[in-house]
Amino acid sequence: NNVKIKSVKLADSVKEIGNQSFYNCTALRDINLENVSQIRWESFLGCVHLKEITLSSGIRYLGRRSFSGCKRLNCVKFEKSTMLKGIEAGVFQNCESIEKISLPKGLTEIGNKAFYKCTSLKDIELPEGIQVIGNEAFYQTAIQGIKLPSTLVEIGNSAFLKCRSLEFIQIPASVKKIGRWSFHGCGQLKKVEFLGEPEEIGEWIINKSTVIRCKKGSGIDAYCKEKEFQIEYIDEEYT
């Protein structure tokens, strides 16, 4: 809660940032994190003047809500490959200025509300290896298009709810579960294409204005007919 600290230079020996270490340090603009391997929960929550962070290949843990509410944070740099296995719940929640982010190889999970209300986020690259996208992970972001990895197994409830700029999404054959309202409220979403056959599909995953492309006679086909969604069948040559 220190409102005067503007810049912090960490010694190379500092490997961990503890819980709420810089919580609501509203004047903080600059801190070096290149040698840090663990950032605990709410470490930088509410640091509204923090604009840029660089995380090294040695980063192995980002605690829940660690950068939540950093409203001016517009540049998050990851190495292409890190030791990080998951983005915990709410890590970048309400970071309203992030426009683009490329997540590192090695990730298997994006937690609940990880990018919740990152309202400027238009472009995100998801690496192969991700298996789970959590509940409300990309709720009300500005994503226009996103390539889901072929390793993805689960899309959580409301994962892309109210992504009003999203126009098209292709669901990989690997996906087994899609939560309720996952793509609901996406007013510009023209089509959702299913390459496989999920075992579980939640309620009202799309608006009725969206077309679902799927295989004729599939479980998705039956789901769409039950919900009276628009259907377009994938051509035999495509399959």
Regions found by a protein language model. Give the residues of each.
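Structural signature of tandem-repeat unit edges
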Residues: 2-16, 26-38, 48-61, 71-86, ...
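Consensus positions within tandem repeat domains that build extended binding/scaffold surfaces
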Residues: 18-23, 40-45, 63-68, 88-91, ...
